Amino acid sequence: MVLCLCVSLVVACNPAPEEGTPNTPNTPEQPTEPEQPTQPEQDSRNELVAQKGYPSGVEVYYFKNYYEESSDDYCSGYYAIVDTKSNPKLKFNAVYVENDATPSNIFASFAGGTPLLATNGGYFWDGESLSLLISGGKVESIAAQYTYPSYEGKQYTACPRRAAFGVHADGTMEATWVYCCPDDNNRPYSFSSPKGNNEKVGVFTSTPHSSSSGKLWTPQEAIGGGPMLLKEGKNVAESNYWKEVLHSGGTAALTYQPRTAIGYTNDGKIILFVCDGRKMNGSSGYTLPEVADLLKGLGAVWAVNLDGGGSSVMVGKDGKALNSPSDGTQRRVPTAVVISMEN
């Protein structure tokens, strides 16, 4: 399948860090011969429409991309590029809600400045967050320490390291694998890989990861999900889907679904992405490797998948959903991402 995208930016890839040394964002060592992404063929039916009314440093686009020239199937959605360096008043906020709410309601009640955009956040079950969330330097929700995958008819216990995106106090951005270590009061530790599990072949680590093999992770704001979609510009979505033990949970990486994702570029721009699926507005959705390819084409070097399916929504500056959630209405969620501007 040829994936036709309305993007044209390219990005260099950086060398992989050694195990036990989490990546250091925004100051990567540059390779001598950077790999360049292969640009897909363009379909004349594709659409890319800039949304008006956002302040300097925020660009929001509607896209509609056909899968193949011979096909009438397509994916549509929205993405936003947020440049906090060009406009220092712009802020990334990870928001935790004790009594879950729709992203539009979270947007409306946001008190940390003027909200401009919001998306749903990490995974949850029965209103309880299953993903890491750090707000104002405080851990509001830890990442799931245990999950219970099935392989060949048998249920196992696994301790997954899962992807998260964070912004540090100095403004640097980082995507890494996180585990909240019981041997240090469940504080989040960063790891350079999801090492230890592979749901595809039935290999699982049931012993909690030790803080001694990671690095204490202390961003000011962070949202967790998984899997990691891009690592140093390389599409790692499919392999990490299995290694982060997300198949049994219903993430459905290799089928067309509504998706939400977040990434960042080498020069420190945040990219938020949401696509519709399940034929809402005719959109089939994307696989996770396709989302990774699109984000890479926009310049992202690291990217993290967030909760998708019926949860996927992007709220615009007027507080209303830009896309069309597949449930027909917005789901109530315990975590969200809000882009705001200081008053």
Predicted segments with their positions:
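Zymogen propeptides
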Residues: 14-22, 33-183
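C-terminal motif of bacterial Sec signal peptides marking the signal peptidase cleavage site
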Residues: 9-12
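Conserved, well-ordered active-site substructure
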Residues: 128-154, 240, 244-302, 306, ...
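Second-shell loop/turn segments in exported
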Residues: 92-97, 216, 277-281
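Sec-dependent N-terminal signal peptides
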Residues: 1-6
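Short glycine-rich loop/turn motifs
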Residues: 74-79, 162, 224-226, 256-261, ...
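Active-site-adjacent helix-turn-beta-strand microarchitecture at beta-sheet edges
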Residues: 128-253
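Short acidic-glycine loop/turn motifs at beta-strand connectors
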Residues: 83-86, 166-174, 230-233, 264-268, ...
